Amino acid sequence: MKTLRILYLGGGWITNIGNAFIDLGSIHSLRMACPDIQIYFVSDMPRVIFSIFRANLSNVFDLAGVIKCDHLVLSGAILSAKFIQLNGSVISKLIKKGVKLIINGGGGSTYTEEEIDTVTRFLRKNPPYIFISRDRQTFENYSYLSEYSYDGIDCGFFVSDFFVPAELDLPDFIVLNFDPIGGPFNYLAFLIKHLFDKNKKLFRTSTIDGKLIIRTHHSFIPFMPHRYFREANVLISDNPYDYLNLYAHTKATYSNRVHACVATLAFNNPARLFSNTPRAALLDRVGANTIREKLTYPDIQKIRDEKLNQVKFLSKILVEETS
């Protein structure tokens, strides 16, 4: 029996811990689909971070380009012009070597015609072997370019399949997760006006309606506002499991980060998203269509069914390769 060598290109957790939920979920789904695999996880963060600081990327050593593997797996918002600009050369290099490209729960960034055109041209030159989308529009845009295609879901929903949360010695709590990117500018005023009229000092207090308030932030690179620490009960970490312990137990999550909502829903807890990002379409795929308008409880059976079907699709292809 052959063991498949899989190169997983991900990372960038310190810029957005939601990337960790995607990466860990994707890797777990791969192992569920095919136990006979060896996964080599290589970070794409050097190019991402160094590009922010205008570094000379021609001097970056691309470890991914020299690892011997059978498949290259990408997950998350990788179908974007920026991702292709930063990582397209190493992807093309691997495909020319005979490595098969697997997009496992992929999606776009802006979903503009310009982005779609850029990604389409890249995938025509570097066609995926397996293409699993995380939202319906992405599937419709690119599925025809792959040998095997599936209308799937975001890999972040798999976090509840591998992570066992700790018991917390805490009263009931809610999570507020708002970063200065990715959502409406006036979320603070909206929350106070529409959700917490009883307490106008919500963002300086530690409780609301008898529930503890815990404030998480998903990013501290390339900047971390000092105002974060003017508020009580702040969690900022480079460890995704710290966040998952909270999202697994919260009574509700209010956020402008898509993957704070993904993780919360995955653990069968309600969430509300304060963002108009087109990436939020991935929440529609699991039935959370109202999450932008109101606190929304997950359809946990639908989430389980979607995960199971996605793993079955992947398993049928990969297991056959190992036999």
Describe each PLM feature range.
Residues 1-323:
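Active-site anion-handling motifs in enzyme catalytic cores
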